[in-house]
Amino acid sequence: MKCFLFPLGDKKDEQRSPKPVSPTSNFSDVNKSGSDFSPRDVSGTSTVSSTGRNSNTSMSARENNLREFTIGDLKSATRNFSRSGMIGEGGFGCVFWGTIKNLEDPSKKIEVAVKQLGKRGLQGHKEWVTEVNFLGVVEHSNLVKLLGHCAEDDERGIQRLLVYEYMPNQSVEFHLSPRSPTVLTWDLRLRIAQDAARGLTYLHEEMDFQIIFRDFKSSNILLDENWTAKLSDFGLARLGPSPGSSHVSTDVVGTMGYAAPEYIQTGRLTSKSDVWGYGVFIYELITGRRPLDRNKPKGEQKLLEWVRPYLSDTRRFRLIVDPRLEGKYMIKSVQKLAVVANLCLTRNAKARPKMSEVLEMVTKIVEASSPGNGGKKPQLVPLKSQETSRVEEGKNKKVLDGAEGGWLEKLWNPKNVRAC
């Protein structure tokens, strides 16, 4: 799944920032490159979020407890960035497994993931600064924790690194792919949907400033040792709109298949863009398919276009459910989750629900599907061992409670939805 960036010409309502100041004392040489998200950008301006609260001042007032590492520290932690310890690689650079001392108990070590950003000039620097600024001041059980950072000159030039908590169970994308030796059970998929909704709700609505993720996708949802899902990779995140503005205008960046249609067409970014991406992700969980897969037959390459004909007939609806589940799910649970996806995929961005409303709907589905389990996280099933305008709360509840033939299609009018 490739990322994209296309400029949209002159963006007159783009928020402008003063020249940045390095987040680390030894990174002054890079300041000339500029960034929208440096600490001075946060503290030296007075923009206010769409909720009417002072976004940047609120961010700067939050305590930043990030550790500052040296290149030497991280070489030691990763065995000199050993290829055998590489756990991820992409356009951003490479990610290595490592260990660092536990500050609370120096006799113990903790596992970490060290992201070494590639040399992509200004864009790479901006993404590094964005992650430091955002993840340095936010904390939530469904966001991957940033532990520290490093920005330092060595013989190869300026090195930019980020140190995260280690997520041993990889990404949701991996477990939905044929590469995975295990299958995410339906109950676990529901929990992942709930965890992801919690993370987005926190970013959009639970702070005194709003963060728009902008690159919500299954590969950016990681799983910890308890299979709790956490959002990761905030390099493309943006602050929400300032007062009097309905959106943030910006270059269109993200991942093909997840980006909201109005964002692609106009470059106007709102939190409802993330809601669209969440709807696409729900259909990934249901079908086990990627949003855009060129290896599929022509009529099946775009996920949203492929599922559309099956939504008008509840008997045929089963045909889009991930066959690796082998029928081990309650069909009404799947159908109700599809209703949530359809609400998120409403063509009119203003009519999409807020993430807090989405979270409430998904939570009800989880509770109905897993009664009496004591809140325990469902487990994986090894593949080889398997046997076989704004939506109102009242309307959302009615939609979820009614599951008769044709309702799926009625909620998602094919004329109003276009696959990206």
From Swiss-Prot:
SUPFAM superfamilies: Protein kinase-like (PK-like). The modification Phosphoserine is found at residues 219, 249. The active site is at residue 215. Residues 1-64, 369-396 are annotated as: Disordered. The modification Phosphotyrosine is found at residues 164, 263. Residues 22-36 have a biased composition (Polar residues). It is found in: Cell membrane. ATP binds at residues 87-95, 115. It catalyses: L-seryl-[protein] + ATP = O-phospho-L-seryl-[protein] + ADP + H(+); L-threonyl-[protein] + ATP = O-phospho-L-threonyl-[protein] + ADP + H(+). It is a peripheral membrane protein. Induction: Induced by infection with the bacterial pathogen Pseudomonas syringae pv maculicola strain ES4326. Functions redundantly with PCRK1 in basal resistance against bacterial pathogens and in regulation of plant immunity. Functions together with PCRK1 downstream of the pathogen-associated molecular pattern (PAMP) receptor FLS2. Contributes to the induction of SARD1 and CBP60G, which are transcriptional activator of ICS1, an enzyme involved in salicylate (SA) biosynthesis upon pathogen attack. This is Serine/threonine-protein kinase PCRK2. It comes from Arabidopsis thaliana (Mouse-ear cress). The lineage of its organism: Eukaryota, Viridiplantae, Streptophyta, Embryophyta, Tracheophyta. The gene is PCRK2.
